[in-house]
Amino acid sequence: MFKFNEDEENLKCSFCGKDQDQVKKLVAGSGVYICNECIELCSEIVEEELAQNTSEAITELPTPKEIMDHLNEYVIGQEKAKKSLAVAVYNHYKRIQQLGPKEDDVELQKSNIALIGPTGSGKTLLAQTLAKTLNVPFAIADATSLTEAGYVGDDVENILLRLIQAADFDIDKAEKGIIYVDEIDKIARKSENTSITRDVSGEGVQQALLKILEGTTASVPPQGGRKHPNQEMIQIDTTNILFILGGAFDGIEDVIKRRLGEKVIGFSSNEADKYDEQALLAQIRPEDLQAYGLIPEFIGRVPIVANLETLDVTALKNILTQPKNALVKQYTKMLELDDVDLEFTEEALSAISEKAIERKTGARGLRSIIEETLIDIMFDVPSNENVTKVVITAQTINEETEPELYDAEGNLINNSKTSA
């Protein structure tokens, strides 16, 4: 240990300037000295910077209200689902932030989320927008492509590979990402009774997903596909990955209705019919998911269930026009680049919405309807300098007339004849 000569003049810390008799220790280097207090301070600074680097994406965690405000900019309606998601996601990342030395014995467990709603109700968009809000890696998987290990199809580890790829192979980032698994209802057991036949895309897949949902160190093939002996693997801890599971769960209303009917004493079971579809879904319970075909262990790992409502004409019209990246704004901008104004009448917006409801595609089908309507316009207009404005009417959407084309003076330059 370094010792100072007694006749040597009083030494000072080269960083804070304190004399050696003012501190407990003074460590000497090549012409410099540092005291124990400065060493402790430097150590704290390094630890803080390391902590910031490992949780860079969530250092400034938005509040549930801020998360919901951001969701409102891109997702129309579904207020209850957005509130449930905002609280669940906030609590999830708050839990990650507090990981480290425990001051007490309370351990915060992860709560994955299930989104139940019809096709086109906004399940995928909600999950995508959440990931953007929090600046974390995001991956989408389809449960119908998954099978048990040893059968043709994707292993569940391939879901993790997509997240790793979204994080540019930064494992630390991937371990704090979000994975959305769609069509989760399609891996429900075919009946509540176990069967001697193999259900390679049902209960077996639930068991495989269960491992990564609850938190495990998974071995992921870097090139995807099946695992092979002697293959180099990527190791990833799924403990802090948030899983959002989505599904339409067609027919689950009947399951809920049966449960409610059984509990109505002194009334006929038809009494449960007074509930409309949305009111029924609002009363969904874990036992309903089990009756539908999800195993109890799987349900236990997804404690938060948010119900999304079927979108009506008004909601679909709002989706077309109100969000920051609304479809009408996108196509208007597209034609604007060719110096052409695009206008949809109110009746046209209603017709688009009604057609999406007819097709049972919800918001997901809006883009294809607009694309079908505008394909000829987007083909012809760039080579027709006379056109400065295009008006889309309800008749255009219903394929009764062509879009109305106008020149710079406001003159109609096509006759809007009934389409052949």
Curated annotation (Swiss-Prot):
Keywords: ATP-binding, Chaperone, Metal-binding, Nucleotide-binding, Zinc. This is ATP-dependent Clp protease ATP-binding subunit ClpX. ATP binds at residues 118-125. GO terms for cellular component: HslUV protease complex. Gene3D superfamilies: 1.10.8.60, ClpX chaperone, C4-type zinc finger domain (6.20.220.10), P-loop containing nucleotide triphosphate hydrolases (3.40.50.300). GO terms for biological process: cell division; proteolysis involved in protein catabolic process. Zn(2+) binds at residues 13, 16, 35, 38. GO terms for molecular function: ATP binding; ATP hydrolysis activity; ATP-dependent protein folding chaperone; protein dimerization activity; unfolded protein binding; zinc ion binding. HAMAP family: ClpX. ATP-dependent specificity component of the Clp protease. It directs the protease to specific substrates. Can perform chaperone functions in the absence of ClpP. Pfam families: AAA_2 (PF07724), ClpB_D2-small (PF10431), zf-C4_ClpX (PF06689). InterPro entries: AAA+_ATPase, ATP-dep_Clp_protease_ClpX, ATPase_AAA_core, Clp_ATPase_C, Clp_protease_ATP-bd_su_ClpX, ClpX_bact, P-loop_NTPase, Znf_CppX_C4. Component of the ClpX-ClpP complex. Forms a hexameric ring that, in the presence of ATP, binds to fourteen ClpP subunits assembled into a disk-like structure with a central cavity, resembling the structure of eukaryotic proteasomes. Residues 1-54 form the ClpX-type ZB domain.
